[in-house]
Amino acid sequence: MEKIIECVPNFSTSDPKVLDLLKACFKKHGVLIGYECDIDHNRAVITCAGNPKKVIKAVLQAVGVAVQNIDLNTHTGAHPRMGAVDVIPFIPVKNMTMQEAVEVSKIVGSKISKKFDVPVFL
């Protein structure tokens, strides 16, 4: 039975060029569902869902894009933020438990920390 997980990462940007790069990460893996962008908050929210391995790959690629292209030293916006990527919630959709979604979040957090040398709060 195929497992499906949803993820809704929040990025601290409203730059159309960066948003296109971020969306491309999810399109490449066939998991992009939609996105919202708010200029006043300088924030983009992407919704993706699919096979957990594909979602993980897309999220990690998008975090790399965010780390390279979002500079919080010059960031403005009404929304409070902690990083280029603020939150990466995982939601079990089909044939997955909440505990499995939590495990996915721990795997992703560990990979982000190691690959990009940034702090991760779980």
Regions found by a protein language model. Name each.
Residues M1-L122:
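Long, contiguous binding/interaction regions
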